[in-house]
Amino acid sequence: MASDNDIYNAFKDATGVQKSLLRESSAEKALHEAKYVLKNDKLEEKDISFRCQYKAPYSVNSIKLSFNFKKNDYIPYRICAVVGKNGTGKTQFLSQLASSLSGLNGSDDEIVFEGKRPPIDRVMSISYSVFDGFNKVRGEQSIYSYVYCGLQTENGILTQDQIQRNFKIAYSEIINRDRFDDWENIISEVLESEHQDILKQIEADDFSNINWSSGQHILISTMTELVCNIERESLILFDEPEIHLHPNAI
């Protein structure tokens, strides 16, 4: 389909293509990137800005939202915030947005994009809240286009042992993917200077003797999962970031 426009045009709207082959956002992005690479012999720099309409549960009218990530010399373009009073549906919106952008739950009538779904490679959901509404798929159940980095599983809150196990898996993958320097720079910024010895203990595989607080454990584990899983054109959805937010992590 990437190399032959006739085949693409003949099958692009077929149910099997839309519901299976291109269901995940990463698959749709790969198709369009392949078409561009075959034509131009280089990767295209993407603008993942998008507009959508969201109909919250029990709401009569849809809400129009715009997310601008276009590069600008004067205004930062990497962060957008959703602000509203308690009970207005912010958490539900982020949950639905994660599913719609990644293709995790297939079609979703609650969120309608203006035009095509944005070319996002991977959606990463983070929450330190025990009430977050994100899909909790992990491990073998997860799909490439979606990663959950929160404190819960489908069966409840993660234990300290489970958090540490997830951390070890992510850290091992960081080493394998040659991302250690990036990880070390980020964790060094997160930790206070008097706690930098934690880094040395992690590098020495001395986990049993690490004297980290529960907050440090959660923060380092989450940042490690992020570094492990992030890709180009990833979108990180952070619900209630003020919970457990460490000053150095801002």
Question: What are these language model-derived features?
Answer:
Residues 103-137:
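Flexible phosphate/Mg2+-sensing switch loops adjacent to catalytic phosphate-binding sites
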